[in-house]
Amino acid sequence: MEPIEQQLTELRTTLRHHEYLYHVMDAPEIPDAEYDRLMRELRELEAQRPDLITPDSPTQRVGAAPLTAFNQIRHEVPMLSLDNVFDEESFLAFNKRVQDRLKSTENVIWCCELKLDGLAVSILYENGVLVSAATRGDGTTGEDITSNVRTIRAIPLKLHGDNIPARLEVRGEVFLPQAGFEKINEDARRTGGKVFANPRNAAAGSLRQLDPRITAKRPLTFFCYGVGILEGGELPDTHLGRLLQFKAWGLPVSDRVTLCDSPQAVLDFYRNVEKDRPTLGFDIDGVVIKVNSLVLQEQLGFVARAPRWAVAFKFPAQEQMTFVRDVEFQVGRTGAITPVARLEPVQVAGVLVSNATLHNADEIERLGLRIGDKVVIRRAGDVIPQVVNVVLSERPEETRPIVFPTHCPVCGSDVERVEGEAVTRCTGGLICGAQRKESLKHFVSRRAMDVDGMGDKIIDQLVEREYVHTPADLFRLTAGKLTGLDRMGPKSAQNVVNALEKAKATTFARFLYALGIREVGEATAAGLAAYFGTLEALQTATIDELQKVPDVGIVVATHVFNFFAEESNRDVIGQLLAEGVHWPAPVVINVQEIDSPFAGKTVVLTGSLSQMSRDDAKARLAALGAKVAGSVSKKTDLVIAGEAAGSKLAKAQELGITVIDEAEMIRLLGA
């Protein structure tokens, strides 16, 4: 056997293995970018030796065989995949090939849309009624998922409108929005169920359940993008026209579809979508570019496994493979011990990544991770990089287990894990230097006591030199003592002292937030302050009384109660008040006297606002008698959803809570 023949055999075997894991087992071991690289390598070798191309090569077909656990449906029209381009030069070369094949000097009109990261499906309608649905499978035969697809509310069971064909096979992508993905994983962590690595895996796992009742509980959705069978009817002769016709019949279509009359316009579309990608609310991994004219599509035809008239222009990979060199353990403000993987640096989505959070001991166990393992790293938007999975088939022999500490890595105190919690915590409290540093950084932060100029490096030095042990010690600092710190001159030192003096005048809500009580964020602190009015009333509240506050359940109430029951915490509060920390007396709002649709309502804000800041919105809502909470519960009356709203919106919809957008909020604020 020639060396190139051996290389081809090995590449095909590797690709088939990963196709099986991806299409059949829904457990991909490598990122898409690595699969694409292997496929390009195989194509290049086969181009050198066309005589060695075999009919069963991965370049000659679409995917892997379907599971036998489902009935099979044979696609009357094969479901082909698309070829990929990864940079502007490759796209321009594709554009030139199309123009050359058409023998045209005029620009082609391109229809550009999003490349959704979900599961490709075909849905067959007969006389407008949904009769069957199937996965892509190997492109020729897919799995019968009719019962599961019927549970997806975005997909109509019956088309409406005129001129519906006798048989119409719609093709599109089933996917899971980010909010739904977060909700599924949140529920799984709480109940000990399966946690999905990404929305695509969650969508695939949800759609391919043998029990459709499970699928029905998952917030899947669907966009259509093409047609297979068409009998007893007609469709427009442009791709965009067909999408608009689908929409008229009640089928969901993405609103990010654009006609481009030049290669430059296509590149502009690509860049704009890439910029907007973090705010879409669902995962995409590129854009799809198709010749708009169906007549020209027919002229161009197909290659073995893909059309010549379309291409997927993929974004830089959000997943890459690297090695775990070590695992270190960080201690946070509340004593939570978080394992952090130290990685062989790798570029992911344009950023050099050398660390990734491992969350907790359960996550390490779920991954089956060992030091030295080859892993897949994912970075999406502003999310902290995380380890998606271990590439077990490439595990080195010299890996070693990760041993979770039994004592705090900073102060040596015992660690504990409360039953029912995933987090392991240091029991050292403020004697732990790490907890002390993080607690003080939180205390002086902008949304807490807002001490201007008191940065992290100053706090680190104050703790390391034993100048500060509690928040009250900050207000005892002098310019002389601060001048002794690194890079701190007399003027800077005096500015910090002045900022500390100014910070003494605060609000009750900010003060509560600054104390760093577990599970008490800004909104909960504001709710506690508004409900109890005074520190004395809050300190003496029972757990039952605390639960009467919007956004406060048994867990938060217990944390608040335990915090004030601790003598050392009451002592620090006393010292802070003695140093002059103060806030205005509470203003009692009689909501019955306020003429506003928000009066007396518990309101939750989610997503980003464009017309005003979140703080301004909270202040205006509170002034109109609303109780602004930080999370959605059965006590919530109204959710205001801005752009890229997340899991709070999903929970509100699940509970049947009224949801309005920012425009409606602004209208009601002026009512």
Swiss-Prot record:
Keyword DNA repair: yes
Gene3D superfamilies: 5' to 3' exonuclease, C-terminal subdomain, 6.20.10.30, BRCT domain, DNA ligase/mRNA capping enzyme, Helix hairpin bin, Nucleic acid-binding proteins
EC nos: 6.5.1.2
Gene that encodes it: ligA
Binding site for Zn(2+): C408, C411, C426, C432
Family that this chain belongs to: Belongs to the NAD-dependent DNA ligase family. LigA subfamily.
Active site: K115
Record field: transmembrane: none
A single GO cellular-component term on record: cytosol
EC class of the enzyme, as a word: ligase
Signal peptide: none
Annotated function: DNA ligase that catalyzes the formation of phosphodiester linkages between 5'-phosphoryl and 3'-hydroxyl groups in double-stranded DNA using NAD as a coenzyme and as the energy source for the reaction. It is essential for DNA replication and repair of damaged DNA.
BRCT domain ranges (all copies): 593-671
GO MF annotations in UniProt: DNA binding; DNA ligase (NAD+) activity; metal ion binding
PANTHER family the UniProt entry points to: CHROMOSOME TRANSMISSION FIDELITY FACTOR 18, DNA LIGASE
Reaction catalysis annotation: NAD(+) + (deoxyribonucleotide)n-3'-hydroxyl + 5'-phospho-(deoxyribonucleotide)m = (deoxyribonucleotide)n+m + AMP + beta-nicotinamide D-nucleotide
Protein name: DNA ligase
GO biological-process terms attached to the record: DNA repair; DNA replication
Listed cofactors: Mg(2+); Mn(2+)
Residue numbers binding NAD(+): D32, A33, E34, Y35, D36, S81, L82, E113, R136, E173, K290, K314
Keywords, sorted A to Z: DNA damage, DNA repair, DNA replication, Ligase, Magnesium, Manganese, Metal-binding, NAD, Zinc
